[in-house]
Amino acid sequence: MAVQTRLRAEGSQLRLCDTHHAGKPRSVEGSIVRIYMENFLTYDICEVRPGPNLNMIIGANGTGKSSIVCAICLGLAGKPSFLGRAEKVGLFVKQGCLKGLVEIELFKVPENIIITREIQVVTNTSTWHINRKLTTLKTVEEQVAALNIQVDNLCQFLPQDKVGEFARMSKIELLEATEKSIGPPEMYQFHCKLKSLKEKERELENVCKDKVNSLEKMKQRAERYKQDVDRYHECKRHLDLIDMLQRKRPWVEYETVRQQHEDVKQRRDQAKEELKNLKEMQSPLTKKIRECEEFYNSLNMKIKNTADEIKGVSQKCKEKQDALEMKDKQISEINQALRMKKDEEVDRKKKILSAYKMIDEWNNELNTVTDCENLQPQIDAVNNELKHVQEERANIDSDIGDVTTEKINQERENGRIIDRIGQLNNIIKVKEETLQARFRDTHSALMWLRKNKHKFKKEVCEPMMLTINVKDNKHAKYVENHISTNDMKAFVFESQEDMELFLVELRDRQKLRVNAVCAPDKSCAETLPSTPIEELHRYGFFSYLRELFDAPLPVMSYLCSQYHVHEVPVGTEKTRNMIERVIKETKLKQIYTAEEKYTIKVSTYTKLSFSTNMCLRPAQFLNYYVDTDERRQLENQQQNIKHILQSLDKQLMTLCERQKHLECRDNELRQQKKELLERGSRRKQLESKIAVKYDSIRQLEQNPINLEKESQQAKVKIRAINIQKAKLVTELMCHIKNYVSLNICKADLILQSTAVDAEKNRLEAEYKAASVELRASEQRFLELDERKRILTENCKELLKKARQMCNMNLDQHLPKEFQTAFQTLPDTLEEIDAFLNEERSRVSCFTGLSASVVEECSKQMEEIQKLMESIEENKKELDDYKQSISKIKERWLNPLKKMIESINEKFSGFFSSMESVGEVDLHVENEEEYDKYGIRIRVKFHNFTDLHELTPYHQSGGEKSVSTVLYLMALQELNRCPFRVVDEINQGMDPVNERRVFEMFVKTACKESTSQYFLITPKLLQNLTYNEKMTLLFVYNGPFMLEANKWNLKSFCRRRRRLGRMDEQ
C-alpha cells in the first residue's frame, strides 16, 4: 500500500525575525499570496503561503521543491513544455490518482484573485476557475497578462531544467524577454510595431520601385504605339499587293508546268522508237555467242582428257626415276662399307703401335719406381683428423639449421605482429575520421595537441571517444548512454593549469568549441564497488560498467569520480523482468538492463524509491575496439623479436665463418690422404696397366681384315646393280617420248581454246554494250513516261489551285479584273518570287501590328495616368510610414538605452563586488533593422582572460549560473513583474561565489521597491547573512510527519528558543 506524503510545514510566517509589529508587509499587485496543491506530483495535499519579498524554499533532493515551481507555472496558464519535464499536463498528477488540482491566490486591490486549475489524467485536459467561478483558458491568460506575469519569460521564471537555456538565448531573444519583463508595457509593443512597420516599409518601397519600373516601360510602349498606327496603313498596302501576287503566281506556275508537259511528251515518243530499233539489232549476237560457248566447252573437255593422260605418264616417269635413285643409293652404300673396312684396318694397326709405345713408357717408369716406406701411420693420422673435422662440420651445419629455423620463425612472428598492429591502427584511424566528421573543432584541437604536447607539464589524454576501448562491441551502447556527448569529446587533464592553458589557446585565440575536464588529484580508477558483482549475479547482472572497457588512468579516474562507473552494474533481460525486486532489494542508484537504463532516487524522508527508465540509443562512437594492452604487448614483443633477430644474425655469421674454415681444412686433409694413397699404390697400378694393355694387343692382332677380298665382293655387287639400272633407263626414255607428244597435243588444244574464248569475249562485249544501251534507252523511256504522268497531275492540281486562289469554279474562265491586274505584275516565277520576297521583307518590318493598335494605344495612355496616380499615393503612404517609424523609434530606443544602461550599471556593480567584470550593452548591426537588435552580455572571471560573450559553450556551468543570477538581480529593482522564480541556480557554484551571490540576493530582493522573489535551493552555506524581510520555507515530507493543519508554529518557536538557552548554559 502506497505511503501518502504531505507537506508538513507552512512557511509563510517562518522568519528569523517576526515582522508583525512593523505593520503589514507591502505586496506588489500580482504577487503570490498562497499556493495550494492536491494530488500534484509528490504531494497529496500541500499549501504554501510565501512572503512579499525574498522567499527561500529549502529542502533536500526529492522532497518536492521543484513541484512548487511546476505548480506556479501550470497554475498561471503555463505550458508543460516550458518546464522541460513532460509534454502532457496529465503527467503532473500524482501517480495512481485520476485528477489533480493547483490553486494560486494573487494579490490585488481591492480583492485577491484565486486561479484554480483542475487536471484530468484520462483526457489530459484542464478545467479553469477564477474566484471559484468556471472560466476558460483564454480568460485566465488575459487575467495573468494584465498583471504582467510571464511564466514563459526566462528573465522572470527560470525552472530548474531551463537554467541552461538562459545562456543559450540569442541576443535578440534576450532583448525581447527583458522588454517583456522590466520594460514599460508599451516598450515591447513599440518594438513589435517598429519591426512590423519596417517590414511594411520594405514591402511598400519594393511596390513603388516595381510600379516606377512598370510606368517607364508603359511610357516606352505608348511611344511605340503612336508610330505603329502610322505604320499599320503602310503595311496594309503592301499586304494587298502580296495578295494579288499570290493569286497570279499559281497561273504562271500552271503555264510553266503545261509547257514542260508538252516537251516531255514529245521526248518520250522519240525514246520509244529508239528502244524498238535496239531490240531488233541485238538478236543475231545472241546466236553467235551460244555457238562459241558450245565449241569452247568441247575443247576444254579434250584438254582435260589429255591432261589426265599426261598425269599418268608423268607418274610412271617418276616411279622409274625413283627406282634409278634407289640403285645409285645401293652402290653408294657398298662403296661406303668398303671404305669403312679400310679405315677400320688402318685404325687397328694404329692402336697396336700406340699400345706398344705406352707399354714401353710404363716399363721405363716401373724401372724408376722402388718400394715406398710404410705410409699407414700417416694415413691413419690424416683419417683421424679428417673424421674430427667432419664431425665438427656436421655439428655446425646442425647449429646453422637451428639458428636459421629460429630466425624464420621469429621473422614470421614479427610479420604477424606488424599485421595485427596495422589492423589496430586502422581501427584508430576510423575512430578519428568519425570524430572529424561529427566534431570538426574537436578534431582540429586534437591535431594541435599532438603537435604541442611538450607545452604541458603533465599527461593530457585525447578525447574520451578515442581513448575508451569497449572490450565487446555489443556493450558500447551502455558506455555511450552513460557518458554525455560533451564528455565523450572532452580532453582529460591531470593538471588544472594545463587545462587553463589549453582552453585559453583553443577557445580564446583559435575560437574553437572544445570541451576539457580535469581528473581528480587522487586517482579513483581503482576504487572498489560497494557490492561485489558476485552478489548481484542472482539479479542477472554480469559486470560493472567499468569492467566493460579500457581507458587511460586519468580518464578512468574521472569517469569513476564523475559517473561512478565502478558502481553501475549491467544486467540482462532477466534483470528487466525482475526490475521491481531489484530496485526494492538493492541500493543501486543506476542500473542497465539489456535495452534500458534505470535511475533510482530515494526520498530522504519517506525512504520511498522513485525510478525513471529510458531506452538505450545505439552506439555511435565506441563500436570499434582497440585493445591497448594487446597493442602494448605487441609493441614489446616486436622490440624483443628485433633484439633476438640481431643476436641470431651474429650467431649465424660466426657459424658460417667457422664452417668456411673447416671446409678449407677438410679439403686440405683429403688432398694429403689422396697423395699418400697414390704414393703407396703406383707400382701396382703400372704393372696392372701393362698386363691389361698386352691383352688388348693380342685381341687386336687376332682379328685382321682381308681388304682384297672385301674389294672383289663389292665390285661383283655393283656390276649386278648397273645391269638393272640400264633396263630402267630404257623404260624411262619410252615414257618421256610419250609425255612430250601428249604435251604438244595439249598445247595445240589450248591455243584453239584461247582463240575461241577471245572470239566469245568479243561477242559478249558487243552484246553487253548493246544491252547497256538498250537498258539506258528503256530507262530513259520509263523516266520520261513517269515524268509525263507527274506533270499531267501537276497541271491538273495547279489549275485547280489557281482557280481556288481566284475563287473560281472548275469550268469558269479568268475574270477580266484579274486579267487587268495581272498585266501590271511580273510574268515569270522568278520575278514574282523576287517581288513577293521584297514585299514580304517590307511587311516583316511592320511586326506586331494589328487592327487593334489604335485602340491599344489609347488604352495604354489611360493605364499610364492611373499608374502615376497610384505611385503618388504609395509615395505619400511611404512618407507616412517613415514618419511613424521615426516617432516610434524615438519613443522606443531612448527608454530602451536608458533601461539597458541601468541594467549594465547594476550588472557591472554586482560583478565588481565579486572581483570579476561584467557588461551589458545594446547590440546593433544596422540601426534600421529593428528585428536584429539584441542585448549582449559579456563577462570575465579570470584576470588572464578578456571579456567574452556569454554563450552555452565558452563558460563553465558555474560561471553561466553566476552570470544568469546576476543578470536577473540586475533586473530586480527595475522590474515591473510581480514576482520572479529561480530554481536551483546555485548548482555548480563554488562556495565563495555562492556566498557572494546569496548576499546580493538578500540585499537586492529585500528592498522596499522590489517585487516578490522565489529562490529554490537544496542547501545553504553556514553563517549566511539574513534579512528580516526574508521568508524561509522549509520543505519536509515523510510518512511520520504531522499534517500541515496540525503544525503549531508558535509552540515550535518556543521550544526552539528554550533549547537555544539550554545550549548557551
From Swiss-Prot:
**Keyword line:** ATP-binding, Cell cycle, Cell division, Chromosome, Coiled coil, DNA damage, DNA recombination, DNA repair, Mitosis, Nucleotide-binding, Nucleus, Telomere
Q: Which Gene3D superfamilies match?
A: P-loop containing nucleotide triphosphate hydrolases
What are the GO BP annotations of this UniProt entry?
cell division; cellular senescence; double-strand break repair via homologous recombination; positive regulation of maintenance of mitotic sister chromatid cohesion; telomere maintenance via recombination
Q: Please give the GO cellular component terms listed in this UniProt entry.
A: chromosome, telomeric region; nucleus; PML body; Smc5-Smc6 complex
- Principal subcellular localisation of the protein: nucleus
Q: Which parts form a coiled-coil structure per UniProt?
A: 134-156, 186-400, 628-805
InterPro entries xref list: P-loop_NTPase (IPR027417), RecF/RecN/SMC_N (IPR003395)
Q: Which GO terms describe its molecular function?
A: ATP binding; single-stranded DNA binding
Establish whether keyword Chloroplast is in the entry: no
Q: Which residues bind ATP?
A: G59, A60, N61, G62, T63, G64, K65, S66
Q: Where in the cell is it found?
A: Nucleus; Chromosome; Chromosome, Telomere
Function according to Swiss-Prot or TrEMBL:
Core component of the SMC5-SMC6 complex, a complex involved in repair of DNA double-strand breaks by homologous recombination. The complex may promote sister chromatid homologous recombination by recruiting the SMC1-SMC3 cohesin complex to double-strand breaks. The complex is required for telomere maintenance via recombination and mediates sumoylation of shelterin complex (telosome) components. Required for recruitment of telomeres to PML nuclear bodies. Required for sister chromatid cohesion during prometaphase and mitotic progression; the function seems to be independent of SMC6.
Q: How does it assemble?
A: Forms a heterodimer with SMC6. Component of the SMC5-SMC6 complex which consists at least of SMC5, SMC6, NSMCE2, NSMCE1 and NSMCE4A.
User: To which protein family does this belong?
Assistant: Belongs to the SMC family. SMC5 subfamily.
Q: What is this protein called?
A: Structural maintenance of chromosomes protein 5
Q: What's the source species for this entry?
A: Gallus gallus (Chicken)
Gene that encodes the chain:
SMC5
